[in-house]
Amino acid sequence: MQLCIALDLPSQEENLKLLESLVGLPVWIKVGLRSYIRDGKEFLGRIRQIDPRFELFLDLKLHDIPNTMGDAAEEIASLGVGMFTLHASSGGEAMREVAARLARFPRRPLAFAVTALTSFGEEGFREIYNASLESKALDMAMLAAQNGMDGVVCSVFESQRIKSYVAQDFLTLTPGIRPFGEPSGDQKRVADLHEAKSASSDFIVVGRPVYKHPRPREAVEKILEGIA
């Protein structure tokens, strides 16, 4: 299991200060919409300057027509990031196009398809998809696997079911991790480290429990110890 730290602080300066406290730790750094829109691709270079060993995860959750998604995937791959996200609900054709574009790169990023955001509960999910969250997440995961994606973004509670349904080596990336029993906030489907390990999550994402901790490095070290 690998750890991704979400950079969700209000300013670039605060995010960089957080990163400076984590130098030398074996973590992925997740750059989401807020940071990328505000700070641009130059921000990725600043992260690398702080510690070139940080692995970069660009979490933009692409969702568009196939050609546009393919173009975006090529641009993302050219940035040299290690992984990125798109929505499985963009469809099989769009995911096939992304996979085909990525195949042009000798060293390409991992592509993860989002099934159901962890902010969804069952009721909210049904309002949009008119289906149960678990069954639809399984179907989306299979669609993603059949169309060239490396894995899916899902909650811990779907992770092992998806692996059993698709393949044990199909990757799962699970947000909504509350390692020290923190409040769930705007997330509906949250889990602790033990649950993530039991569900065979390949990557976990932790944000607020790290950057709101008075000693972020200590928090990350404890998480790394817990998933070792």
Curated annotation (Swiss-Prot):
It is an enzyme of class 4 (lyase). Keywords: Decarboxylase, Lyase, Pyrimidine biosynthesis. It holds the Pfam family OMPdecase. It comes from the Bacteria. GO terms for biological process: 'de novo' pyrimidine nucleobase biosynthetic process; 'de novo' UMP biosynthetic process. PROSITE patterns: OMPDECASE. InterPro entries: Aldolase_TIM, OMPdecase, OMPdecase_AS, OMPdecase_bac, OMPdeCOase_dom, RibuloseP-bd_barrel. It catalyses: orotidine 5'-phosphate + H(+) = UMP + CO2. Its EC number is 4.1.1.23. One of its GO terms (molecular function) is orotidine-5'-phosphate decarboxylase activity. One of its GO terms (cellular component) is cytosol. Substrate binds at residues 8, 30, 59-68, 118, 178, 187, 207-208. Pathway: Pyrimidine metabolism; UMP biosynthesis via de novo pathway; UMP from orotate: step 2/2. SMART domains: OMPdecase. The active site is at residue 61. The keyword Lyase applies. HAMAP family: OMPdecase_type1_B (MF_01200_B). Belongs to the OMP decarboxylase family. Type 1 subfamily. Homodimer. NCBIfam families: PRK00230.1, pyrF. Catalyzes the decarboxylation of orotidine 5'-monophosphate (OMP) to uridine 5'-monophosphate (UMP). This is Orotidine 5'-phosphate decarboxylase. The gene is pyrF.
